[in-house]
Amino acid sequence: MLFNINEKGEPLVISFAPFLSPEAIKYLQENERCSDQSQKRTAQQIEAIYTSGQNILVSASAGSGKTFVMVERILDKILRGVSIDRLFISTFTVKAATELRERIENKLYSQIAQTTDFQMKVYLTEQLQSLCQADIGTMDAFAQKVVSRYGYSIGISSQFRIMQDKAEQDVLKQEVFSKLFSEFMNQKEAPVFRALVKNFSGNCKDTSAFRELVYTCYSFSQSTENPKIWLQENFLSAAKTYQRLEDIPDHDIELLLLAMQDTANQLRDVTDMEDYGQLTKAGSRSAKYTKHLTIIEKLSDWVRDFKCLYGKAGLDRLIRDVTGLIPSGNDVTVSKVKYPVFKTLHQKLKQFRHLETILMYQKDCFPLLEQLQDFVLAFSEAYLAVKIQESAFEFSDIAHFAIKILEENTDIRQSYQQHYHEVMVDEYQDNNHMQERLLTLLSNGHNRFMVGDIKQSIYRFRQADPQIFNQKFRDYQKKTEQGKVILLKENFRSQSEVLNVSNAVFSHLMDESVGDALYDEQHQLIAGSHAQTVPYLDRRAQLLLYNSDKDDGNAPSDSEGISFSEVTIVAKEIIKLHNDKGVPFEDITLLVSSRTRNDIISHTFNQYGIPIVTDGGQQNYLKSVEVMVMLDTLRTINNPRNDYALVALLRSPMFAFDEDDLARIALQKDNELDKDCLYDKIQRAVIGRGAHPELIHDTLLGKLNIFLKTLKSWRRYAKLGSLYDLIWKIFNDRFYFDFVASQAKAEQAQANLYALALRANQFEKSGYKGLYRFIKMIDKVLETQNDLADVEVAAPKQAVNLMTIHKSKGLQFPYVFILNCDKRFSMTDIHKSFILNRQHGIGIKYLADIKGLLGETTLNSVKVSMETLPYQLNKQELRLATLSEQMRLLYVAMTRAEKKVYFIGKASKSKSQDITDPKKLGKLLSLALREQLLTFQDWLLAIADIFSTEDLYFDVRFIEDSDLTQESVGRLQTPQLLNPDDLKDNRQSETIARALDMLEAVSQLNANYEAAIHLPTVRTPSQLKVTYEPLLEPIGVDIIEKSSRSLSDFTLPHFSKKAKVEASHIGSALHQLMQVLPLSKPINQQTLLDALRGIDSNEEVKTALDLKKIESFFCDTSLGQFFQTYQKHLYREAPFAILKLDPISQEEYVLRGIIDAYFLFDDHIVLVDYKTDKYKQPIELKKRYQQQLELYAEALTQTYKLPVTKRYLVLMGGGKPEIVEV
């Protein structure tokens, strides 16, 4: 019951319906089942929405509508009188929180519109107003609220900021680490500490490996509910526990004995095969059979009588006996088929071998571990102290502060527990122990609602622990008084082709050992509607493998990057989908394991004209060319005597010094000085006092004067202005921001430069001032091998999506391609020198000196790296955890698809053979085989081979090179009658494009001030040509008339003919060829053909180029011969930018363009421009392009301070090349 006040001040009483009883819920489920609604809620969804008064764990499979359930449950709570601000709702991301809030808002609006009860309308309106203040967000956001409000109770100021930039964190960490390292090196136990550092770094001077160890231990501890207690009590847990053979866990010994018995059973099965050959021709037992029977009997006896024969104390003896008994190989061959009978046992023996020796030396490493524990504890405290001093914290710090506040202040904790009616959490499978502790403190013990899917837990690298979900699942199933488990199995996203293949694959792969969940009936996907079950034969899943038998590179299947052939397979399938089925590009998504090494995808797709967008977020910002140029510019301003930065700045497009210029400058040294920096040489070159002043010609001297004048102004400004203003001054002074707009990926490049200015501004606002400190911070980021995220730019909507599997979680796409299925899982962590585990603590590889054991006397020491017992335990658990997460990644990837899923990989067809698995457990592949297979592709092929008699709902196809030719792949169909890119791509058609633009704006140009408003910041020479010549001169009209078509011109297409090559493409190809053509060789057909291979055009365009005409230009014209004679003076395809004044608006703007060719001499310049326009009389083109060449000449004169004495047009659009002097 809720009270509101009406306009007269009288109380309004709202009576809310009570929460539903179990019987009422069953009644509602039955009504829903019998209803005639087109989309019905499932019985489990109804149960999840309306069950109350107890803890609830909802296990929601992919596409089962978990967000719908959460929204409906929240709305039901509100309608039953629970205010939205009394619900705690945790989401995994800020984006998810925003979407959930929007859905609740829409539901409330809908409910307000439907209700006729005035009092209810008022109440729902209040809920709508309270929605923005409700606790709907991430755990990090909530922790910040708690600390901001109650931080005073633990001595933390409410005025803090979050250090979201990893680079800033690493800079502070490095300072703390260096100081602490010096202290430990000078303490009483310094010898032990030095031994610790050497164990990981090899020597005390190189501390990088030891620093990584400390940082990793610190980060790992931060994911626990109490880092200090974990470091004190759990960090050395395994090191203290496992010191003798008797300490080895019973579970590990059971696994060894199980492997022995399995090997005996498997060997017996093999010997019982008909073709095995138990008897010789004489009828006696064969030697092989006798040997195998001995192995079977002894293994069985040793397993049965382990305790009396060996026991834990005699484990090393058992290992020696078994090693001596079984053969060194893994396989037993029967009828040319190899059965890996001994493989698993060999792996187990390797794990236990040398145990006695390891345990003997393991005790020596314990003092080192105690030193490490002390150092990490001291580092944690010192790092936190620095952050408290700066009042800047990481998210994990804030979460721990929040936990401490709630644990130490009973009244604060109880106020939250009494306030929240329910504590709800989404994506529960991705929680870590710190977050779990916080949720426990907020709950009253019986009001938690948790939604997740163990099969989609893929954030172990963020210390998420799927066992939190698993433990709750088991506890609630065993002890129903603790809570209730509700399974949402119906999938409303995917067609049966996707559901069937997902069920088929994971029913053979996933169990609690690998995957952390048994993929049985509880977890299998079920179609949620009849429409999803309608079969489509063409949507059957495909495993497409490039046959690498003829792969010249012989690249291994575990190579990191995807191959060109694999990408071509994808392109072929996409072209087929787009052309034959009309599938829009935006319906197709490519999923990859990581963001790195995917450039070949974009490059190949560009070749085939397939638009593609990536999910961004790559950590390559500081490595982008434009940012590196600017950073070197700033380094030079800070210290001109930094030769590396200075050379980079001189060579950059801002000043464009070439190798010859730099060589001339480098020779201007002072013979009296041993060391001479480049900046000093530049200054001597300018005043003519270098060692070889005759090498500094007037043009170079002019460039040097401009450079020194510009640098001087920048250095002066750096002392007075802000970093932000300095960066923009550099952009404006040298037009670098405009220059990158003419380069590849211009939008991204400009966004990166803009972000550099913003980040510099943010740096100064955070309390750091000055160019020197900014450069120092950037260099420290690079030293720690970190980077900053690229800036995201707006992406086209109609394009294929390329994203990581992690980024795709929660999304859905009609067609999904899972790429690089042959990429090996990253097992880097299990080979490190240390492995951390929440229960066992740290396990390390110990560098032991076994000189005494070997009786060695001549050598000072004999060092061997030993895997200590804690390390081995952690390694095995980590291996299974890694494989489990990879399996869940595959599940997430496959269940993103709505209609069809493709697997793309690479394998050798000739080397592939049938995979056998005699130890498979019913439907499951054996644990040994699943541990052995290390790619998605391996899993799929193993299932296809071993369960070949089943319908697995996917086909395996090998793709040959002959299937990937240009003709086989095909080309995209373009439905437009006219190519919309014609005007854009044709360098000679800018006149028409600009004229059409001006026709639309002609009325506005009549106003005096409109000219300034519409003046572009940047123009091209072609645009200017249009501005000042008659708008519709006869030539322009003639071109437009020729481009139009009448019905009488229309003819039926002749499909046997090839598509006509566009004139614009030929023009572009000609310019490329003229740019790359080597003029040092005689120009003939062979030279032209060789150069033609290096240009970026398709074969049709290359074939359409008239090479004889180009050869004639160089051989038969004086200008062509001039090119070859003075090639050292020639500059080709040179970009430029100059400042111009608009005559109408009197506003300045930047003029930029690309000059085809010019010859730079000591006292003059010769300008050349190629044109491919069709013409009747050369005089037509001379008039048309006269002003454009004048602009080019003006740009060259401004740059070099030299006159342009000759201007030539090379006309290639006629029957033969013609030269026109303008």
Swiss-Prot record:
What's a BP term from Gene Ontology annotated to this protein? double-strand break repair via homologous recombination
One GO cellular-component annotation of the UniProt record comes to:
DNA helicase complex
Sites binding ATP sit at A60, S61, A62, G63, S64, G65, K66, T67
Per UniProt, residues of the UvrD-like helicase ATP-binding domain are 39-495
Which Enzyme Commission number(s) are on file for it? 3.1.-.-, 5.6.2.4
Which keywords describe this protein according to UniProt?
ATP-binding, DNA damage, DNA repair, DNA-binding, Exonuclease, Helicase, Hydrolase, Isomerase, Nuclease, Nucleotide-binding
Q: Which GO terms describe its molecular function?
A: 3'-5' DNA helicase activity; 3'-5' exonuclease activity; ATP binding; ATP hydrolysis activity; double-stranded DNA binding
Domain of life, per UniProt, equals Bacteria
Q: Where is the signal peptide?
A: none
In terms of CDD domains, this protein maps to: DEXQc_UvrD
Which residues does the UniProt record annotate as the domain UvrD-like helicase C-terminal?
524-810
Q: Which cofactor does it need?
A: Mg(2+)
Under catalytic activity, the entry for this protein gives: Couples ATP hydrolysis with the unwinding of duplex DNA by translocating in the 3'-5' direction; ATP + H2O = ADP + phosphate + H(+)
Similarity comment: Belongs to the helicase family. AddA subfamily.
Subunit info?
A: Heterodimer of AddA and AddB/RexB.
Q: Matching HAMAP family, A to Z?
A: AddA (MF_01451)
Q: What does this protein do?
A: The heterodimer acts as both an ATP-dependent DNA helicase and an ATP-dependent, dual-direction single-stranded exonuclease. Recognizes the chi site generating a DNA molecule suitable for the initiation of homologous recombination. The AddA nuclease domain is required for chi fragment generation; this subunit has the helicase and 3' -> 5' nuclease activities.
Q: What is this protein called?
A: ATP-dependent helicase/nuclease subunit A
Question: Lineage, please?
Answer: Bacteria, Bacillati, Bacillota, Bacilli, Lactobacillales
